[in-house]
């Protein structure tokens, strides 16, 4: 899996967690070093922040994450399914 250290300006990243649970694409338009993090700007106008060796970042005011590649999206979805399947109602 890619980390945000591997991501460059112009690369495609994947947004998951929007209201309809779709996976959308955006690109990195700015990437600035901030100690152990990257401050990011995306082509959709939002800004975010990621750990340098992380596979996901936050995005603006949205309750969604931006993943470095599609494998990271799949891993996150599978982990959430595992957590939800263990909840007893």
Positions of the model-derived regions?
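Intrinsically disordered, low-complexity, charged/polar segments
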Residues: 39-89
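Short beta-strand-centered aromatic/proline hotspots
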Residues: 22-33
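Short, surface-exposed secondary-structure boundary micro-motifs
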Residues: 18-19
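Short, internal acidic amphipathic alpha-helical interface segments
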Residues: 35-37
């Amino acid at each position: 899996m890619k980390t945000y250290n591997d991501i460059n300006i112009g690369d495609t990243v994947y947004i998951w967690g929007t209201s309809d649970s779709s996976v959308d694409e955006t690109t990195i338009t700015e990437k600035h070093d901030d100690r152990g993090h990257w401050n990011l700007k995306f082509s959709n106008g939002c800004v975010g922040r990621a750990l340098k060796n992380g596979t996901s970042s936050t995005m603006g005011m949205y309750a969604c994450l931006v993943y470095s590649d599609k494998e990271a999206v799949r891993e996150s979805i599978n982990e959430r399914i595992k957590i939800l399947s263990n909840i007893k109602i």
